[in-house]
C-alpha cells in the first residue's frame, strides 16, 4: 500500500530530474547563443560610437580595455559552445558560466566608470538567464553574485576611482544611497521572480507525471 502511495511522487521526482537534465543543457545552449549575440551587439555599439568620435571617451585606453574583456568573453563563449555541442555538460558548468558572466559584467562596468554606468543593467539580464537552466541554486547564485558585483563596483568607485575623501566631501560625485538600495532590492526581486519560474516549471512536470499515472491506472 505504501509503495502504491509513494509511486506517483517518486515517478514525478524522476520525471523532473530527467526533464531538467535535458532542458538545462538545451537552456545553456540558448543562453550561450544569446550571450554571443549580445556581445556582438554591445561591442558593435561601442565601435559605432568610436567611429563617430575617435577622440571621445570611447577611444584610447578605454577602447583597449573594453576590447580585451570582449575578446576574453567571446573566447570563453566559443569554448562553451564547443563543449555543449559535444553534449559535455557537467553539473557545475552552469555555475561556472554564470560566475563568468557576472565577472565580465563587473569588469566592463568598472572600465566604464563604476556603478553609475547604464551597463549595471546587464546584471539583471544575467539573473533572468538563470531559470533557463532550471536550477534554483543557480538562481540564488546569480542573484548573490550580481549583488556582490554591484557592491564591488561601489567600493571600486568610492575607494579607488574617486577616492574616499573626495567622494564623501563632494555631493556631486556620490551615488545616492537610495539608488544603491533600490538597485540591490531590484536584484533581489528579479531573483525571486526567476526562482518562481523554476518552481512553476517543476510543478508543471510533476503534474503531467501524476496525470499520466492516473490515466494508466484508469486504463
List the predicted regions and their residue ranges:
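Short regulatory/linker helices and ligand/cofactor-binding micro-motifs at input modules
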Residues: 21, 28, 212-219
